[in-house]
């Protein structure tokens, strides 16, 4: 005989076994959300500090150049141009980009402000990149052609490079607005980004990054070759010490004359040459680090910026933000690298702060 099933006890026991699992899942979800919120706040705070530090450091460089008379000449005008572009990145670009991140990469500030932000972004970042290129070219010519590259020629060339830098940056940034070259704002999806038109993508990425990248890599290769040639020529102009004596006889004219040379060293290097070589080595090292940091900061962004529209490939929003802010950070590193390898700036900073007190 079949036993009756206790439906009441069954129905009461089932929820009791599921309730702890639900509470555990809810608690884990809350913990995960609170952790992500705390992490997001930390990241956004760090980005805010990055923008403030970029503004402060570049403004300090600009103020020093303006206050110290000895800096009113090349190559400090190139450094001033770079500092201006990096200050503008910190003032006009980073704050709105931070607002964009706070709103989950949704643009809620309207079409006009979107167009202005994108134009400033492209203008300032492109100018910063080309200013790095101009400094690298100036260092290359001063190292390899220091006799021809006189102060007058250097001033003229640097002014032309500054003019071309800002003119090219303006053309690249304003092209979508002036010629209707793609759309930067989408009201439906609340997106604000650089025009995804394939032809503009090629034009802007080549003009803003790939062309200056080729220039700086070529420049550093030439600087490296010049430094290697200098080291080789210095070795050929010296006689190293030898462990044993060497006798040289001239049997044709003076059979009785014997010259003995022991542990001899002959060099044809003056103190001025040594000082110049040390200065050139510091300049070459500075240019190398400046170029290396520039490539590390901007290469991931511009690779994805070129591939994404051409291949219809949407990268995750998180990686877009990482690559974009990594590029912005180059504006923070530029003045640090340049002033670290220029002793005159450290003394100028001391004079500047002493006057403020």
Curated annotation (Swiss-Prot):
Glycans are attached at residues 6, 21. InterPro entries: 5HT5A_rcpt, 5HT_rcpt, GPCR_Rhodpsn, GPCR_Rhodpsn_7TM. One of its GO terms (molecular function) is serotonin receptor activity. Central nervous system. It is a multi-pass membrane protein. Disulfide bonds join 114-192. Keywords: Cell membrane, Disulfide bond, G-protein coupled receptor, Glycoprotein, Membrane, Receptor, Transducer, Transmembrane, Transmembrane helix. Residues 64-76, 138-155, 221-287, 340-357 are cytoplasmic. G-protein coupled receptor for 5-hydroxytryptamine (serotonin), a biogenic hormone that functions as a neurotransmitter, a hormone and a mitogen. Also functions as a receptor for ergot alkaloid derivatives and other psychoactive substances. Ligand binding causes a conformation change that triggers signaling via guanine nucleotide-binding proteins (G proteins) and modulates the activity of downstream effectors. This is 5-hydroxytryptamine receptor 5A. It comes from Rattus norvegicus. The lineage of its organism: Eukaryota, Metazoa, Chordata, Craniata, Vertebrata.
């Amino acid at each position: 005989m079949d036993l009756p099933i206790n439906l009441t006890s069954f129905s009461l026991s089932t929820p009791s076994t599921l309730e702890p699992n639900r509470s555990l899942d809810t608690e884990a979800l809350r913990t995960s959300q609170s952790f992500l919120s705390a992490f997001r706040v930390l990241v956004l705070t760090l980005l805010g500090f990055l923008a403030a530090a970029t503004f402060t450091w570049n403004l300090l460089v600009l103020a020093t150049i303006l206050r110290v008379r000895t800096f009113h000449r090349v190559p400090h005008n190139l450094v001033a141009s770079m500092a201006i572009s990096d200050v503008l990145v910190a003032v006009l670009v980073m704050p709105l980009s931070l607002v964009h991140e706070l709103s989950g990469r949704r643009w809620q500030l309207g079409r006009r402000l979107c167009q202005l932000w994108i134009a400033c972004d492209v203008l300032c970042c492109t100018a910063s990149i080309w200013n790095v290129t101009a400094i690298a070219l100036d260092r290359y010519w001063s190292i390899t052609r220091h006799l021809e590259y006189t102060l007058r020629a250097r001033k003229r060339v640097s002014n032309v490079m500054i003019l071309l830098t800002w003119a090219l940056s303006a053309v690249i940034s304003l092209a979508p607005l002036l010629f209707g070259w793609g759309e930067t704002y989408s009201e439906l999806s609340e997106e604000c980004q650089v025009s995804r038109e394939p032809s503009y993508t090629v034009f802007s990425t080549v003009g803003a990054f790939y062309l200056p990248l080729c220039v700086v890599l070529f420049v550093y290769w030439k600087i490296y070759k010049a430094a290697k040639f200098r080291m080789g020529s210095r070795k050929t102009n010296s006689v190293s010490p030898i462990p044993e004596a060497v006798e040289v006889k001239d049997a044709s004219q003076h059979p009785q004359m014997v010259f003995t040379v022991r542990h001899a060293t002959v060099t044809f290097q003056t103190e001025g040459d040594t000082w110049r070589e040390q200065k050139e080595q510091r300049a070459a090292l500075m240019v190398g680090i400046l170029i290396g940091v520039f490539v590390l900061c901007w290469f991931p962004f511009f690779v994805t910026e070129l591939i994404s529209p051409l291949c219809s490939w949407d990268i995750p929003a998180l990686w877009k933000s990482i690559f974009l802010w990594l590029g912005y950070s180059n504006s923070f590193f530029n003045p640090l690298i340049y002033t670290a390898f220029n002793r005159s700036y450290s003394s100028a900073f001391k004079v500047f702060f002493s006057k403020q007190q």
